[in-house]
Amino acid sequence: MQTPQYLQQRRKFAAAFLAFIFILAAVDTAEAGKKEKPEKKVKKSDCGEWQWSVCVPTSGDCGLGTREGTRTGAECKQTMKTQRCKIPCNWKKQFGAECKYQFQAWGECDLNTALKTRTGSLKRALHNADCQKTVTISKPCGKLTKSKPQAESKKKKKEGKKQEKMLD
């Protein structure tokens, strides 16, 4: 005769075994249900690299614009496309709108030419633009800007005139 403890253990083992068999059957069915997809053939592109034109602003000489791209290839679906682009308005356009330079301080005034010069080194080029590594710019010497104290004295004069008009 078997003890009740032994029978209880046997029932638990049988239940665990049946659960294990059920899980195996479910996994096998799920794998059988999956269809084997034929591998896609990797098609090597006969197309060349995209070559992009410079960014042409929609209006003015900076801001939003477009650029044209072309590529070669006998079996290319697309050989031309247009892309939106942007030319920053704070860049010096005389060196190319897609080239950003880091400039040094202005040099001393050359008395022979009456010009100051400074040099800029290339900081960044947009869209693989063809930019010079260094550039030099010049400007006339001697034009002094108005200092802040003069501007403050003008404000005081205007305020004084306003008060005189109010008194009249």
UniProtKB/Swiss-Prot annotation:
PROSITE patterns membership: PTN_MK_1, PTN_MK_2
Keywords tagged on the record: Disulfide bond, Growth factor, Heparin-binding, Mitogen, Secreted, Signal
Quaternary structure, from the entry: Interacts with ALK and NEK6. Interacts with PTPRZ1 (via chondroitin sulfate groups); promotes formation of homooligomers; oligomerization impairs tyrosine phosphatase activity. Forms a complex with PTPRZ1 and CTNNB1; this complex inactivates PTPRZ1 protein tyrosine phosphatase activity through PTN interaction and stimulates tyrosine phosphorylation of CTNNB1. Interacts with ITGB3 and ITGA5. Forms a complex with PTPRZ1 and integrin alpha-V/beta-3 (ITGAV:ITGB3) that stimulates endothelial cell migration through ITGB3 'Tyr-773' phosphorylation.
Gene transcribed to yield this protein: PTN
Region Chondroitin sulfate A binding, annotated ranges: 147-168
Record region (Disordered): 141-168
Gene3D superfamilies, alphabetized: Heparin-binding Growth Factor, Midkine, Chain A- C-terminal Domain, Pleiotrophin/Midkine, N-terminal domain
One Pfam family here: PTN_MK_N
Secretion signal, residue range per the UniProt entry: 1-32
Region listing for Chondroitin sulfate binding, in residue ranges: 92-99, 123-131
Cysteine disulfide partners in this protein: 47-76, 55-85, 62-89, 99-131, 109-141
Protein family (similarity comment): Belongs to the pleiotrophin family.
Annotated function: Secreted growth factor that mediates its signal through cell-surface proteoglycan and non-proteoglycan receptors. Binds cell-surface proteoglycan receptor via their chondroitin sulfate (CS) groups. Thereby regulates many processes like cell proliferation, cell survival, cell growth, cell differentiation and cell migration in several tissues namely neuron and bone. Also plays a role in synaptic plasticity and learning-related behavior by inhibiting long-term synaptic potentiation.
SUPFAM superfamilies: Midkine (SSF57288)
Gene Ontology annotations for the cellular component aspect, listed alphabetically: extracellular region; extracellular space; plasma membrane
Native source species: Bos taurus
This protein's name: Pleiotrophin
GO biological process: decidualization; dendrite arborization; dendrite regeneration; estrous cycle; integrin-mediated signaling pathway; learning; leukocyte chemotaxis involved in inflammatory response; memory
